[in-house]
Each structure stands twice: as C-alpha cells, then as structure tokens.
Swiss-Prot record:
It comes from Mus musculus. Catalyzes the formation of mannose 6-phosphate (M6P) markers on high mannose type oligosaccharides in the Golgi apparatus. M6P residues are required to bind to the M6P receptors (MPR), which mediate the vesicular transport of lysosomal enzymes to the endosomal/prelysosomal compartment. The chain crosses the membrane at residues 22-42, 1194-1214. Coiled coil: none annotated. Stealth proteins are part of a protein family that is conserved from bacteria to higher eukaryotes. Family members were first identified in microbes as proteins that help pathogens to elude the host innate immune system. Microbial stealth proteins are most likely involved in the biosynthesis of exopolysaccharides. Stealth proteins are predicted to function as hexose-1-phosphoryltransferases. PROSITE patterns: DMAP1_BIND, EF_HAND_1, EF_HAND_2, LNR. Its EC number is 2.7.8.17. Glycans are attached at residues 83, 114, 148, 179, 614, 729, 988, 1108. One of its GO terms (cellular component) is Golgi apparatus. Residues 984-1019 form the EF-hand domain. This is N-acetylglucosamine-1-phosphotransferase subunits alpha/beta.
Length: 1235
C-alpha cells in the first residue's frame, strides 16, 4: 500500500510541468549534503573530538604526544612577570620607599639619633648635581641654636660637636624671617662624627650636611660673603700646598685660607674681607693665570636641603629604563611552543599588568592578578617575589603538577615531563651551590658532627646543633698547634685562614662535594685531587701514587706531598667498606671503585703523623677480606736556610717565610672594573705564584722597649682573634723593618750561622725538597722505610670512607706498623698553568676562630649566582639600603646602643633568607648540609606545596606580609624541594601485613609467617627466631581482648599451623601485638614520603648579563654552541652605562636568532593591546556587558512595538481565538409569568 502511494506521488511529481527540474535539484542537494556531512564527521573525529576528549591532545599544540608521554597527566605553566616601565608601578615603588624611610626616621628619633641621617644608598642618591658643588665640613641646624649659645656652650648641647671651630646664623632663602645655624669644623672626619653622633635629650632638631656651589640659579641658596671659589687652574694640582705656592701675589694677599678640592677641580677661598670679592673678580678679568691657565673667581652659595635639586636624581633612581625588560617573556613563550608543546595551559601572574603584545583571545593563556591568589588581601600591594611565589599554587584551574618559570628562563632544547618527574624515581631535583654558612667560618658540615666548634657556638647555628651543650663534646683539633709559637725556637706552624682552607679545597668547591658522583668543575683542580675521581683519571698522573701490594701494611708518603691516591688494583676487585682514624690532617678520603683507587687529600703544612685505615675489599672471586694499613704523612715543606751578616740586627734575621695568595677569578666582571689590581709575581719551582713576605726571626730581648711592647700587643691581638695570621705576619714584618732598617733587603746566603745570643751552635737546615723535581719526571724507583714494630691504638673516632655502598663501623683501630717496601711513582713534574694556579694551603685551627669572612669569599659551584628574585627592583637592589638600615636600627633598638660603636654591616637579603629557611629545616628535619636549587624551571606539586605551608603556617604568613624581599622570607624553591626530600612517611603496620599476606586472605599462613620472620630478623634465620615470633603472637592472643584480635570472626579451619596453639594470625592481632610491632619498627626504617633523584648541572646554563659587550657576546655564543635544556639570562645591565643599548641590542638579536617564529600567544607586530592593566580591561568589559544588555533590551522593545503596530488586528483576532470571551446569559425574572 505504502509502495503504491510512493509510486503514485512520484509519477505525479514527474508529470508536473517543473517536476523533472525539482527532482534533479533534489538529487544534487542530496549528494552535496552527503559529502558535506561526511567531511564534518571526519574533521570532528580527528581534531575537535580529540581536543575535547582526548587528554593526549589537550595541549597548546593541539597534537597527540602519546608516543612520547608516559601518562596523559595535564601539566600547566605558571609565569611571574612584571612590567618595570609602568609609571603607576614606579609611583607605588616610590611610595613604599618613602614609607620605609618614614618608619626608619621614627626609629632614629626613638634612638635619639639624627632623623635626617641618610642611609648609605640614600646619601648617594641625594647627590648634588649643581656646578662645582662640593660637600664642606659644615652642619646646618634647623631650628637654629639659642641666641645666647656660644661656641663654648655648644658641646653641652651637642657633645659630638666638641670639635667645632666656628658657628654663625644665616637666613632661610624661602623664609628670610627665620634663621638656621651653621656650625663649621676643621676636618671632614670631625663633621662626619658630629653628624652621626646622638643628640642630648632626644632633640628633634634637624641637622643637615652643608654644600657649597657656584650655581646661583638653583633654588634654596644662600650667598656666603666671605667665601669664594677659584677655578681654571691646571688639573695637575692634587695638594693644597702645590696650588698655594703657585698663586699670584695679588690673590694670595687677600685670602686667609685655601682648600683644594681636586675631584671638583676647584679651590675654596676664605677672604680677609667680605668685600674683597669684587676686587678679586676685577683682577682675574685682567688675565690672572697659573701655568698659562686663566683663573676664574666665582661667588660661593650655601645649600643644605638637596631634595629639590636632587629630584632628577631620585627620578632616575626609579626611572623606567632602570627596570626595563627585554621582552624575555615573549621569547620564553616561543621556547615553550617550540620545545615543550605538551603543556596544557599557561598562567601569567602579574600585579594587574598586561603585556602589550599578548593575545588575550587565546584560550590557552590566562592573566592572573595578585588579588586572585592572595588569601589575605591586606598584604597587597606587594613587591616581594617570595610573597608572590608562596601563593601561585592557589591559581584556580591549575593542574596538580605545574611548571613554574620566571620570565628570564626559557628552554634551549626539547623538554619532556620526565625531565622534571618520573613515576619510577620521582621528582628530579637540580642542586647547585651550598647554603651560605650560618656564621662566619662555620660550614654546614661542622654542625652537629660531635665536635664543639667555636665558630658555630652561637644562636645563629643553634649552638653547633647541640654539640656545644654540656661538657661531653670534644674539640675538633688536638693540642699542639698554635698561631704564635716560640719565635726564637725555630720555624713554627703557620695556619691559613679558616673557611677557605678547611671547608673548601678550592674557590667554590666544598670538601663535601668531593666524591659525590658528580663532576664539579670547581673541584676538577689539583688542590681538590680532581674531584677525587669524579671527573675521570686523565689527571691522576699529577697526584702522588702509591700502589697497595699484598702483605704490606705500612706505607710512607714523602714529606710535602698532600695529594695522593692508593691503587688497590693488584690486590682487590672493589672496595666494600672503609674507615680511617680521626686526624685533623685529613681533608677527604674516599674509595673510587670505578678506578680501583683510594683517594687521600690532606691539608698542607701539617706535622708528621700516621693515618690508620681499616678496609674491607673484594677479590676477583667476590670473597671479602679485610686489611689494616698505616700511612705516614708529613705535609710540611722543608724550612729554608738561615744566614748571617756582620751587623748587629742582621745577625738576628732568619729565612723568609712565603705566604701564598691566590687570585680569585671573577669571570662575569669586566676587566676594567676589577679592583684592586693584582700585581703578578714570579713563578716558583712548583709553578705557583707566591708573595714573599719577610718575617725576621729576632731575639726579642735585644729590641728596644717600644718594639717589644708593640710585638706583645700583636701577639695578644692574634691570640684573641682580633687579627688573622696573615695580618699578624704583615704587621710584624713592617714593625721589625722599621727597627732593623734596610738590612733585611740584603741578599741572604744559605749557610750555617752561630747564634751568639744563646751560645749554641745550630745545625744547618736541609735544603727544601721540591715536589716532583724535573729530574725525576717519568722515573720509577723504590725506596725502603723501616720502623720498629709497635702497637698503636687510635683513640679518635673512625670516619667512614664512602664507596657505594657505605657501611659504617665504630671499631677502633689497633695495628702494628711493620717495615715494608713501598713503591713510589713520580710520573711528571707539576707545572700548573697561570690560568689555574692554586695557593699552597695551610692548616688553620678553627678553635682560634681565624676564618675568612663569608662576605668576602662566598664558595660556590660553576653555576653559583646570587639570584635575588624575578622582580626588576630586586635585581637592582632598590630597597637593599633601607633593609640594611632597618636591620641595623632594629638591632640598636633591641640593645639600645650607640650605632657609632655597633656599626652597620651590609646584608645580603637573599643569603640571609636562605640561612633563615635552613635553620627552620634544621629544627624540623635535623641538621644536614644543603644546597640551593638551580635557577631554572621547577615542577611543583600543589598538594606538596600545601602540605609545606600547613607545616609552617606562621612563616609563610610572615613571608606574604612582607612588602619587599626580607631576610626572613621562606624561599620558594629551596623550602619546597627540601621539604619534598626530607618529609618522612611513618611506617604503617597494616601495610607491612598486606605485603606479607600474599594470598590476601586476611590471615597469615605458616609460609607467610616465615616471610615476616625474615623481614624482622637477620639472616640466616634460626629456629629460635621463628618460634620466638610464634610465641609472641600466642601470648598476645591470650592477653588481648577478643574484640581487638577479632579471632572469633575467623573460621577455625581457614589456616592450619604446625603449632596447634598458634591462633589465626589476623591483621588486628599483628597490629596490636606490641612485641611484634616493636620488631617491625626496628627492622623497617621510615621511608621518604616522596621519591626524588638528585641531578647534575649539565643541562643548565645560567648567565649573568652585565654591561661588557664582548663578555656578553661570549656568553651568548657559548649557549649557541652548547645548547642546554634550561637557559637563564639574568639581566644585570647597568642601564645608565654607555654600552647598555648595545648590550640590549645584542641580547635581542640572540633571542631572535634562537626563536624567530612568533608564537600563538602573540599579537601581530602591527597590533597591541588597548589596555595594559587588568582593572582597565575589567572596567571596559563591565561597561561592554552593560551596554550590550541595554542594547538588547531596546532592540527587543522596538521589535515588540513594531509587531504590535503592523499586526494589531491579527494579534487581537488570535487572542480572541485562543482566549474566547464567555457570554453572560441573564436569567429570566421569576416574577414574569408565562402566558
């Protein structure tokens, strides 16, 4: 029926006049629609579908990386960025600085100090920029001194003004009815002391430094009638006396005093008569000259308030160019699109700023303001990078694991998630240089090591981690070495400076870095034994080699050798365990199984001693055997010859003592800016540079009384630690030279001498033996040392050598020394090239506190850089002077002392914050040596970061509160990674039970009980161990109540045991049986909560970009030649330098050469964003939405009105049809009668 109907309709359509055309068009439309539908389906399934539902394609590239990514784990990128050229930002910075200055002014007022005293940077900032403007020894007081106050009364009001030579009043230039007092001093030192001194009774009087200038156009000047400036004379005059002798007679007769200011090329004249200026001015116009140069006399104007004339300098201090960036964020985004296209979204955290080139329409990029992430909005605005970083994990919609970058960090090669994290090994942590010491001369490895170290015995180091509490702690070094010694009794021990020679074998290489399985470039030098084998064996020929032979236990290292290694290739295949006796001569000892060597690196300049080793080795058959060896060492150099002369004092002279001094390389500092200039000296026989400081040995009793007193004072200062040994030697040498005259300069011949003062004939000293003389290059020889057989017991603690694995032992060593033959190999003479020469290091006694200050030598690796933060004002240290001043004032408030005596010590806020966090971590996780994470992209887990902040809520809240970077900030990467590496997962007994319960039955069988016994007992397992465990379980089942053990719920036939008394071993029974849980806790150690892996520095390139063009070009070319995965170009350009523009052009050219293709996140070059602040954009969007809403309302009203106007009748008819009216029928009246 249906088919006939369809056939009839078809015939009807075809029989129609246009039926054929309609059918043709219908067929074409059907075919085209089919193709269109198929294309849409295909396109949807390939791209749109996968982008929306396929997690492998949910990234900025929109492509699948399934063949490279292990898991479809979404990873976002978070940037922190700021536009340093924003005028609103610069105003806010200036306001914060002024607020800090106000607070410090109030603190000075509390301390009774001068409220106008500038900080170190402020004084430089308020620079007088007028013509011939000089700072003179005068102070200006406002309000003025009392009218009856005389010069004699002045010290009673201001004790620090006792050196004043004159005083007078002058009228204020802007208010002539009021005066200010001017106090004159003779010298600059007197005026500085008076300006820095406290005021009696907390006076609020303003005290200013006075300036004189010839620029009469500046505001706030007062003409000085009796003073004048002389200029135009040759600049060769550097002393006042030189200029005074050259003055013409007409000029010199009219002046009282003359003071030359050579730095300004002017001289200040004090005239005899205030009216004499007009006469001098006329005379100078009549061609008054000095050496052909025409002189000029100018009036002198007094000023004191520099705020008006120095406004331009202040504006320059916070100018846009100072904080200008190089569009690093643009190129960093390009690097992500090129080398890390697998990231999902990009979040840019700003203070509300928007990059002018950023494409805000891209759905993959989002601007996040500080208001969106800060929990406490009262902490805003903030200008502290740690405060901002502590909140970035709170970004809404952020992935659990995200990568955090600064805008100056980019990728140089393809990067994948497993460069940051792998599921098998966990988080990859990239560490660089060690945390700065908690105190000067106290490395982190000394804290809580069982020895009380004087340098660490302070609150900053937690009293050496507890080593100095009580009387049980031992001192690190044995007695017998002193810094002074008996001068007349022969050559004494000389100690070097503390941290550089004890804790660091080379500049930037800590002893703890040796043999750590990473080749550290700073350690790959001779003085560090070439990183104890970590950097290969190419330079082993420069070390002293000793071959260990079977049946030999006594070895001797020649005198003066302190870099040696022992080869055990002839007696063993690998080292298993090793300990050595406690001896201060040892700097480092370790086993390198890869090279079959034992490395022994010692301190130079130490007395002869014997080191005992207890080694456990493996032979070729994997059989372990133990050997005990004794090594005699003496790292002192042989003393030089004495000599005699005929003069009285010359007979007291002894050989000179060389004091080496190393050149510290500053690779990133231009040569023209390196100061002081180091003078090169001759190279000695060992190829090292050394400076000859002659220290005469004299009989003290023959010197004058004055010399004896001064020498005793020097000895006392050295004993108290006021001066270092180097300073002691230099001072003593200079002192003796002043009494001995030039006799020390005569050439001293090596020969025997007779000490007539003592009447004893001294034996001539041997010539010092040079290390590896040229005559023995490549030569092999054998020598025999014989010692009497004796037993020596070492009472010091044993140190574990560190072959992998390291097994600790506390056994004491007792080994007889036997006479044996030692094979000595001298392979090549040591010739150190000048580029890598090293000092001869000498041992120092830390108990005396002779340490090199950390501020002078900050040890670090090749990548060590003091990275102050990502914000430009942190890089330029804009607030550093105020932070230093605040720290000083807080210290003075705490003790209420005079700052003149306490002084100010400039701080490094970044280093102080590292010490602060390190101290917190020590208190929570124990004392250990820590290193600073590299400045590179970091993968952060939001959950881990939240756990860290939950553990230290007050510390992070304090960090968030700080407006600028503070010394008590929680450093973001440092605190995060060391929490991740230090957090411990408590042992879960239930988890141990499930591991042993392999059949998952909930009850342990006999086999599973044996497995548990092997886990908690040492192997081989004895019958007593197994039965003891069973008895523990039986006893617990009898003592514990049934509701805890839940034995009644177990079917009796589920498990059958050999011991019929053993109940079903359920999880409840095991977890509640204390003897068993104690055994498990003893056998199972707490594991790290998070897995991690320490990585090297091979893929990190950190470059500090400064203003030296050639140096910058070399740095960038190094990146071009050796591309790394993680590249950081830290901008430290001096934008006021003449080469700053060139450096920025070179940097921009480098960026364009590396990443020339614009990314999807950029607008075309001819476009820029209309709004550069989020609040402007949000206001515009709110206005747009409101306008759109009202526009739609008006349009809807118009449409409705139009419809009603044209279709009114139809609408009414439709209404009547849909809603018909009901007709009302009137009822008939009941009174009406129907007829």
């Amino acid at each position: 029926m249906l088919l006939k109907l369809l056939q009839r309709q078809t015939y009807t359509c075809l029989s129609h006049r246009y039926g054929l055309y309609v059918c043709f068009v219908g067929v074409v439309v059907t075919i085209v629609s089919a193709f269109q539908f198929g294309e849409v389906v295909l396109e949807w399934s390939r791209d749109q579908y996968h982008v929306l539902f396929d997690s492998y394609r949910d990234n900025i590239a929109g492509k699948s990386f399934q063949n490279r990514l292990c898991l479809p784990m979404p990873i976002d990128v978070v940037y922190t960025w700021v536009n340093g050229t924003d005028l609103e930002l610069l105003k806010e910075l200036q306001q914060v600085r002024e607020h800090m200055e106000e607070e410090q002014r109030a603190m000075r007022e509390t301390l009774g100090k001068n409220t106008t005293e500038p900080t170190k940077k402020s004084e430089k900032q308020l620079e007088c920029l007028l013509t011939h403007c000089i700072k003179v020894p005068m102070l200006v007081l406002d309000p003025p001194l009392p009218a009856n106050c005389t010069l004699k009364d002045l010290p009673t009001l201001y004790p620090s003004f006792h050196a004043a030579s004159d005083m007078f009043n002058v009228a204020k230039p802007k208010n002539p009815s009021t005066n200010v007092s001017v106090v004159v001093f003779d010298t600059t030192k007197d005026v500085e002391d008076a300006h820095a001194g406290p005021f009696k009774g907390g006076s609020k009087q303003m005290v200013w430094r006075a300036y004189l200038t010839t620029d009469k156009e500046a505001p706030g000047l007062v003409l000085m009638q009796g003073l004048a400036f002389l200029s135009g004379f040759p600049p060769t005059f550097k002393e006042t006396s030189q200029l005074k002798t050259k003055l013409p007679e007409k000029l010199s007769s009219k002046i009282k005093l003359l003071r030359l200011y050579s730095e300004a090329s002017v001289a200040l004249l004090k005239l005899n008569n205030p009216k004499g200026f007009q006469e001098l001015n006329k005379q100078t116009k009549k061609n008054m000259t000095i050496d052909g140069k025409e002189l000029t006399i100018s009036p002198a104007y007094l000023l004191w308030d520099l705020s008006a004339i120095s406004q331009s300098k202040q504006d320059e201090d916070v100018s846009a160019s100072r904080f200008e960036d190089n569009e690093e964020l643009r190129y960093s985004l390009r690097s992500i699109e090129r080398h890390a296209p697998w990231v999902r979204n990009i979040f840019i955290v700003t203070n509300g700023q928007i990059p002018s080139w950023l494409n805000l329409d891209n759905p993959r990029v989002t601007i996040v303001t500080h208001q969106d992430i800060f929990q406490n909005l009262s902490h805003l605005p903030t200008f502290s990078s740690p405060a901002i970083e502590s909140h970035i994990h709170r970004i809404e919609g952020l992935s659990q694991k995200f990568i955090y970058l600064n805008d100056d960090v980019m990728f140089g090669k393809d990067v994948w998630p497993d460069d940051f994290y792998s599921h098998s090994k966990g988080q990859k942590v990239y560490l660089t240089w060690p945390v700065p010491n908690c105190a000067e001369g106290c490395p982190g490895s000394w804290i809580k090591d069982g020895y009380c170290d004087k340098a660490c015995n302070n609150s900053a180091c937690d009293w050496d981690g507890g080593d100095c509490s009580g009387n049980t702690a031992g001192n690190r070094f044995v007695a017998g070495g002193g810094g002074t010694g008996n001068i007349g009794a022969g050559q004494h021990w000389q100690f070097g400076g503390g941290i550089n020679t004890i804790s660091y074998c080379n500049q930037g290489c800590a002893n703890s870095w040796l043999a750590d399985k990473f080749c550290d470039q700073a350690c790959n030098v001779l003085s560090c034994g070439f990183d104890a084998g970590d950097c290969g064996q190419d330079h082993f020929h420069e070390l002293y080699k000793v071959t260990l032979l079977p049946n030999q236990t006594h070895y001797v290292v020649p005198k003066g050798e302190y870099l040696s290694y022992f080869s055990f290739a002839n007696i063993a295949r690998r080292g298993v365990e090793g300990t050595y006796s406690d001896n201060p001569i040892i700097r480092h000892a370790s086993i390198a199984n890869k090279w079959k060597t034992i490395h022994l690196i010692m301190h130079s300049g130490m007395n002869a001693t014997t080191i005992y080793f207890n080694l456990t080795l493996q032979n070729a058959n994997d059989e372990e055997f133990k050997i005990q060896i004794a090594v005699e060492v003496d790292t002192r150099e042989a003393p030089k010859l004495n000599s005699t002369t005929q003069k009285a004092y010359e007979s007291l002279v002894s050989p000179v003592t060389p004091l080496p001094q190393a050149d510290v390389p500053f690779e990133d500092v231009p040569k023209e800016k390196r100061f002081p200039k180091i003078r090169r000296h001759d190279v000695n026989a060992t190829g090292r540079f050394q400076e000859e400081v002659k220290i005469p040995r004299v009989n003290i009793s023959l010197l004058p009384k004055e010399a004896q007193v001064r020498l005793s004072n020097l000895d006392l200062q050295l004993e108290r630690g006021d001066i270092t040994l180097k300073g002691y030697n230099l001072s003593k040498s200079a002192l003796l030279r002043s009494f001995l005259g030039n006799s020390l300069d005569t050439k001293i011949k090596p020969q025997a001498r007779t000490d007539e003062t003592k009447g004893n004939l001294e034996v001539p000293q041997e010539n010092p033996s040079h290390r590896r003389p040229h005559g023995f290059a490549g030569e092999h020889r054998s020598e025999r040392w014989t010692a009497p057989a004796e037993t020596v017991t070492v009472k010091g603690r044993d140190h574990a050598l560190n072959p992998p694995p390291v097994l600790e032992t506390n056994a004491r060593l007792a080994q007889p020394t036997l006479g044996v033959t030692v094979s000595k190999e001298n392979l090549s003479p040591l010739i150190v090239p000048p580029e890598s020469h090293l000092p001869k290091e000498e041992e120092s006694d830390r108990a005396e506190g002779n340490a090199v200050p950390v501020k002078e030598l900050v040890p670090g690796r090749r990548l060590q850089q003091n990275y102050p933060g990502f914000l430009p004002w942190e890089k330029k240290k804009y607030f550093q002077d105020l932070l230093d001043e605040e720290e000083s004032l807080k210290t003075q408030l705490a003790y209420f002392t005079d700052s003149k005596h306490t002084g100010r010590q400039l701080k490094d806020t970044f280093a102080d914050s590292l010490r602060y966090v390190n101290k917190i971590l020590n208190s929570k996780f124990g004392f250990t040596s820590r290193k600073v994470p590299a400045h590179m992209p970091h993968m952060i887990d939001r959950i881990v970061m939240q756990e860290l902040q939950d553990m230290f809520p007050e510390e992070f809240d304090k960090t968030s509160f700080h407006k600028v970077r503070h010394s008590e900030d929680m450093q973001f990467a440092f605190s995060y990674f060391y929490y991740l590496m230090s957090a411990v997962q408590p042992l879960n007994i239930s988890q141990v039970f499930h591991e042993v319960d392999t059949d998952q039955s909930g009850v342990l069988s006999d086999r599973e009980i044996r497995t548990l016994a092997t886990r908690i007992h040492d192997l081989p397992l004895s019958l007593q161990d197994l039965t003891g465990l069973e008895h523990m379980l039986i006893n617990c089942s009898k003592m514990l109540p049934a509701n805890i053990t839940q034995l009644n719920n177990i079917p009796p036939t589920q498990e059958a045991y050999y011991d019929p008394n053993l109940p079903p071993v359920t999880k409840s029974l095991v977890t509640n049986c204390k003897p068993v849980t104690d055994k498990i806790h003893k056998a199972y150690k707490d594991k790290n909560k998070y897995r991690f892996e320490i990585m090297g520095e091979e893929e990190i390139a950190f470059k500090m970009i400064r203003t030296n063009v050639s140096h910058v070009v070399g740095q960038l070319d190094d990146i071009r030649k050796n591309p790394r995965k993680f590249v950081c170009l830290n901008d430290n350009i001096d934008h006021n330098h003449k080469d700053a523009r060139t450096v920025k052009a070179v940097l921009r050219d480098f960026y364009e050469s590396m990443f020339p293709i614009p990314s999807q996140f950029e607008l075309p070059r001819e476009y820029r964003n209309r709004f550069l602040h989020m609040h402007e954009l949000q206001e515009w969007r709110a206005y747009r939405d409101k306008l759109k809403f009202w526009t739609h309302c008006v349009l809807a009203t118009l449409i409705i009105f139009t419809i009603f106007s044209f279709f009114a009748e139809q609408i009414i008819a439709l209404k009547r049809k849909i809603f018909p009216r009901r007709r009302i029928h009137k009822e008939a009246s009941p009174d009406r009668i129907r007829v």
